[in-house]
Amino acid sequence: MIEGLREDLRNRRIGSGMSRLDEHWVRCGRLDPHDEDAAGLLCYVSQWVDAGWRDIDVIQDGLCAFPKGRRVGLSILDYAYVLMAEGVVWVAEENIARALANFDLVLSLKTEIVEREILALAHFWSSRCNRKAGEYDRALEHVSEACRLASEADAGPMAATMRVAESWLLFQKSRTKDALKMLSEADAVLRETDDFLTRGNIESSYGRMYRREGRYDLGLRHFSAAIDEYGKRDPEHRNLARTLTNMGYVERLIALQLRKRIDSDVSQHRRSEPELRRDYENMRAQALAHLDRASEIYRLHANHRGAGTVCVNRGHLHLDSGDLYKADDEAREAYALGEQKNDYILMARARLLECMVENTKLEEEIDDAAWVAHLALEAAKEAVDLARRTENRRLLARALIWLGLTTCTTSPGSLDAAREISEQAAALLKNEVQDHIWEDLQVLKARVVKGGNVDATLQAWSQGVVGDRTFQQLTEDFADLIIPKIWEHESRKVARVSKRLSISPKKVRRVLARLGLHGA
């Protein structure tokens, strides 16, 4: 039995492994604690539960046969088996610290464990824990080692499933070309299997990568393909809920693009096409429907990260439509869910949404201005603090951007601080595509430049007061000051600015784009 499960897992023969388990359950009804292979079977069954067979309560029930006192008498390999199974349960319960402790203990026994697959799985699960905690460097180290061990064990399909996770971590580090290549290679291997969950993960990864590049229609197509793959195994799998959440996120971004077109028509006294407004409303409705369905699935699995992410995305949709109090409620619920699991990423996202809500209240002069300003600034500061506890660069950049925007709004005399915050965010987004987060950065830069005291800046430079800025940074600062002014004087003609300053039009456009002015 155990050897068959191991081989099916190594080769990702999912239907075969599940049939094998179903037959065993018909005969026995549960794991036999007196079986000499009970610990090993429990370990491998935990991997099959992760692959889509039954629920985690099967493993929780099996662990009752291995209380702490009994584990002392186990062999080292059986002890490792039990630790692995228990770690999988901790992950399912979102207790990342305890799960990592289990997997670390297994890896500390590596000289005594001959099964390379077990060591590969321990590294793989450690990577999943690190990734969930936003510890991407450590996650990448673990998953790379997992892939190496699986390959050495001649478990190519198993290694391919691990490559999917590795590709996403590479993408997080802006190594998009490497990530896509690795994902394509894994896809080629797993297309020959019935591992529908991992095939769905591949499609979902493509969708998220294309979403990041602003190719929203292509992203939605891959998300739809992912849902089809997941549905072949389990129409209520938590990964399907994650993809529905991603779809809702992208549909909101598309709706925002449509609204910008509508607002542009209004500002230019043009009448928008009825189809445009209908498309906008339909896209918002689709986003909310997908988020509601995701919420139902996450509720079945009691998944805090997923449920909280739905709250954040739904809150942004409420914010977009001007329903500030619903948006605020969603932000607070998301924060509470994250706080229960010490989920810094979710907590930071929740505080970011709260900050945006309070900033909107300030703009619309809702509630006491001083108190709202205080709430906005505190939410922004906490979002930055929480994001710094992770290695999520985009999350930190976004938190910094909104701290900068809030500082500009609530403390007009603190533009130097806002400028420094803007530079920190820009450094984090240096190799990123020009998406909605980048657009927020341009708004911040424009506010800093517009609100700054140019005479005071030039006077400070003339006295040699430049802080810790390099000559290159000072050159860029000067370009940011002078080029927009001349652009205005020259009727916003890039060619005239280029000719007057004897610089390339490309340089002019780059500076204006950096400040969010080009094309305005």
Set out the residue ranges of the language-model regions.
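Residue signature of alpha-solenoid helical repeat architecture, marking inter-repeat boundaries
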Residues: P33-E36, L77, E117, P157, ...
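Residue register of alpha-helical TPR repeats
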Residues: D37-L41, Y81, L121, T161, ...
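Structural motif corresponding to the intra-repeat A-B loop/turn of tetratricopeptide repeats
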Residues: N11, E93, S126, A133, ...
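Bacterial C-terminal helix-turn-helix
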Residues: Q463-A520
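TPR-repeat structural position
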Residues: I14-G15, I56, I96, Y136, ...
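Amphipathic alpha-helical segments of tetratricopeptide repeats
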Residues: W25-G29, L63-R71, D104-T111, S144-A155, ...
